Amino acid sequence: MIGYEQLLLQKGSLASTLELLQAVYQSTERQAAAGMVTQNDVLSAKQNLDSVQAGMMTIEANEVKIRQTLCTMLGWAYNASPEIPEIPEVDPARIEKMNLETDTQKALENNFTLKYNRLSKETLTNGSVEMQNLLRTISAQEAEVKASMVNLYYAVTQARNELGNAQTALSLEQSKMDLAERKKALGMVGNLEYLQQKNAFATAEVNVRTAELGLLQAVEAYDWAVQGNLTLSQ
């Protein structure tokens, strides 16, 4: 579901970019007709537009494919059109409740691989080679869980900081967008300049939602590890 929404975000971002590049291409053509730019400039603008259009076609094809897969997995006909709701934001309380020390202890207790190996230990003879090997394996796995929990914890912290930065950037672009809207109403801004600001604002919106999804993924990965669902290399 997260992957599907991320794809829709890319689609929305490209749609805004397409609108801007279409305007840039048309403006470049007019400038070329007036002798203000060369045909190479026109070609470059057209290539940029074509590249983004190709990217949009790829995203739309992937959107159909993912949607059909989701429908099939959920028991609908592959060509059904169910409403797929937006994924909710992370509850800040989930992050506030995180405690690396106690959560790491829970992860050690709950890890399925460690549980299996601890049970296997009960079937071995004390002092045997097999017992010694298993004890070393368990020790290495416990160290891996501890290290992974540290990494997952700081991944959440980093994702939260990235969201804060994205929200700050969006606030700035919102102010610029509001100003551009007022200027447009008064005829004080050209269409190309307005579309550039509109695209910058749309990009900032996408960045915030992308950061929200990134934070959700980081929190989910942390919670899964606490519940014992951490794959170990040993």
For each of these PLM feature ranges, what is it?
Residues I95-E144, S148, L152-A155, G190-E193:
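Small/polar-residue-enriched beta-strand and adjacent coil segments characteristic
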Residues K11, L18, Y25, A32, ...:
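Leucine-rich amphipathic alpha-helices with coiled-coil/heptad-repeat character
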Residues Q6-T58, N161-R209, D223-W224, L230:
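Charged, solvent-exposed structural "stalk/scaffold" segments
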